[in-house]
């Protein structure tokens, strides 16, 4: 069985210089874990939603010069891809791992989803755990901690999703390398489930 939890070696992959060299390290160290997570949590999400979920490990095929600074496995209801749909992600940067649900700029249903989120704005503010974080750009590691946001701040991020063509919105958790050093494989898998649970109602709002 492939160990799915991330180690210091996995995070250090993002210090490897050169596109080919870093991609080789990603494929050797991280992709087997993402594949294992993909199989397990595609099944989990399918059971939770009564829909068929498929997993997609990032290939970084468009990169010709610069090596990737993060990598991930994404989960959607389309066999061919995920970027055009609301989706879940598990992945890592050199500084942290992440577990997200969200919509990125390629998704054509951002406007409808933003309106649904705004209708349930107070519920989102109340029901998203305080230690969760919000990202408005999946290509950058910066986030906003949920407990520091006023309802108006959350409203502005959601409205931006509807009005700005390249806008994105993702929500979930970060896990530091230090946290992983004290975390068993079973604890990591349980952490993923406990993170996805409060995000499933957001997925349901996307599919009303």
Swiss-Prot record:
It comes from Bacillus mycoides (strain KBAB4). This is UPF0637 protein BcerKBAB4_3786. It comes from the Bacteria. Belongs to the UPF0637 family. HAMAP family: UPF0637. Pfam families: DUF1054. SUPFAM superfamilies: YktB/PF0168-like (SSF142913).
